[in-house]
């Protein structure tokens, strides 16, 4: 990890995921687009997360989060971002691709078949090119209780841990 709060994607320590809460900036959504949220006028709206797993209690609001990732390696990295709160209404991940963003959309307001990864939680694949450094954004909307347990996994470690979990659950 870098002192500035940038998470270095390679190597991730051990097989455990990294909890992203300590690296997140959080801002209340005022109906802005990704273009507006990434602009310099909105940058000061992002505040550090109040806890490793931010908890908003009962709400019907939407929030933006952002976190920096870096891949200092000459090889690409395959990662997974997991939102371990399967009852969120709308979850969006914005991954920088040049000057634009690739948008993943998920949440219980959408059919399961539209998920980027068929999983009980919201999971998004993120491919970091060599020497990547950039900011990823997420938008969350929820009516009801709302907390954000968001994890960053190495893709292989995610799949291995998920297979083991399914095996254990299947044995009951």
Task: Locate each region found by the language model.
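Bacterial N-terminal signal peptides
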Residues: 1-5
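Soluble non-transmembrane domains of integral membrane proteins
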Residues: 7-165
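Selective detector of the "anchor" transmembrane alpha-helix that sits immediately C-terminal
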Residues: 165-172
């Amino acid at each position: 990890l870098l002192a500035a709060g940038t998470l270095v994607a390679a190597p991730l320590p051990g097989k455990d995921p990294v909890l992203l809460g300590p690296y997140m900036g959080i801002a209340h959504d005022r109906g802005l687009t990704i273009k507006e949220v990434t602009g310099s006028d909105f940058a000061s709206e992002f505040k550090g997360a109040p806890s490793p797993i931010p908890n908003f209690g009962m709400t019907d609001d939407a929030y933006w989060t952002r976190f920096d990732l870096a891949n200092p390696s000459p090889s690409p990295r395959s990662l997974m971002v997991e939102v371990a709160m399967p009852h969120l209404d709308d979850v969006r991940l914005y991954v920088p691709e040049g000057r634009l963003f690739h948008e993943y959309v998920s949440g219980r307001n959408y059919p399961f078949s539209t998920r980027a990864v068929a999983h009980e939680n919201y999971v998004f694949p993120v491919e970091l090119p060599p020497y990547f450094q950039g900011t990823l954004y997420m938008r969350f909307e929820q009516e009801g209780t709302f907390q954000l347990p968001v994890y960053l996994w190495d893709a292989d470690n995610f799949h291995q841990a998920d297979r083991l979990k399914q095996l254990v659950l299947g044995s009951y």
